[in-house]
Amino acid sequence: MKKIFYLTLILIGIPTLSVLLIKPKEKEIIEKKYMFEKNTKVRVKRVEKNTIETIPLEQYLIGVLSGEMPVSYELEALKAQAVAARTYTLKKMETNKNNQFDIVDNTNDQMYLDNNYLKSVWKENYDSYINKIKQAVNETSGEYLTYDGQIIKAFFFSTSSGKTENCKDVFGENLPYLVSVSSTWDESSPSYLDKKTFSKKDFYEKVNLPYEDELDIEITRNDTNSINTITINDNEMKGTDFRYELDLK
């Protein structure tokens, strides 16, 4: 009988995108009102359609908030997410002003769901759900975050392993407002102990390594106790790359 081996991964300690809004000793993150024109638009690359749509900024944020946070969350949580999403978008618009588009509509930037899609999935709940999302966006209209007078890179995440990551460990860039802190309340998240199970064959395919009967895995950890590198049968890769290859949260 052919034996099938399975590898189960507990998703703890693998770096994810994280944002930490802190108040350093000399400088601080400040929430400001962005005095943009009412017709300010964001150029969104719709990846599956391979098109670029120009969408009013605040309307775009309604689609982002719908895609990035469950509508069942408390209004104040949705409002905080709206500020983070607006900040992230403004930074991308600033960075990509000379490019064809500002931002993409998937998790490479922010998940954006258009109105037609939301109607199809929310069905009879559409009106109440969309009104709650709109309230969160409207009540934070124009609000964004800066550090030392500059719009911050407002990366955000769903669930950490109990600590956020240093920006340098994930993106290779030192940012004083993106440093590791304890985030123990993430332990109550339904995603905290998420796991994925792969057959050995699928696992090798996903990490682009030749199949071997013997599977030897070694890991090193960084200062936050997250996975820094993972070595699979003498092939070393970064923990962040391993996460992306296996599509881990």
Listing of model-derived features with the role each one plays in the protein:
Residues 91-249:
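Extended substrate/cofactor- or partner-recognition/assembly subdomains adjacent to catalytic sites
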